[in-house]
């Protein structure tokens, strides 16, 4: 440590370098997550929803046989597919963030840290 309890210049420079690298990697990760298409399905597979790695809705597919079962069945299957897609998408995001930060335990909001 340098005077006044401050780290030496080399340590400070290294910390800034690491911060810049994490920022660049985070931007790249953001682009990768945006490009992902993560599928979630209802238990019977007749409803599917795709989200990006950032939980942005991309598309929905409903089997015509599901539609003939009425509104309640269609809504339940659609919700199940959405929950599945959301869980997979947030899980993917969390894994990728942990890879990016190298286990720094940043306690990011919404990331279960």
From Swiss-Prot:
Its main location: cytoplasm. GO terms for cellular component: bacterial nucleoid; cytosol. InterPro entries: YbaB-like_sf, YbaB/EbfC. Keywords: Cytoplasm, DNA-binding. It is found in: Cytoplasm, Nucleoid. The keyword Magnesium does not apply. One of its GO terms (molecular function) is DNA binding. NCBIfam families: DNA_YbaB_EbfC. Homodimer. Belongs to the YbaB/EbfC family. Binds to DNA and alters its conformation. May be involved in regulation of gene expression, nucleoid organization and DNA protection. This is Nucleoid-associated protein sync_0026. It comes from Synechococcus sp. (strain CC9311).
């Amino acid at each position: 440590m340098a005077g006044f309890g401050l780290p030496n210049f080399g340590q400070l420079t290294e910390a800034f370098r690491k911060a810049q690298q994490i920022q660049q990697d985070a931007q790249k990760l953001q682009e990768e997550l945006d490009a992902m298409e993560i599928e979630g399905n209802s238990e019977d597979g007749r409803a599917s929803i795709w989200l990006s790695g950032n939980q942005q809705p991309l598309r929905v597919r409903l089997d015509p046989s599901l539609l003939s079962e009425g509104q309640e069945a269609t809504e339940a299957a659609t919700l199940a597919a959405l929950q599945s897609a959301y869980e997979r998408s947030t899980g993917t995001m969390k894994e990728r963030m942990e890879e990016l930060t190298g286990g720094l335990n940043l306690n990011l909001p919404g990331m279960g840290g």
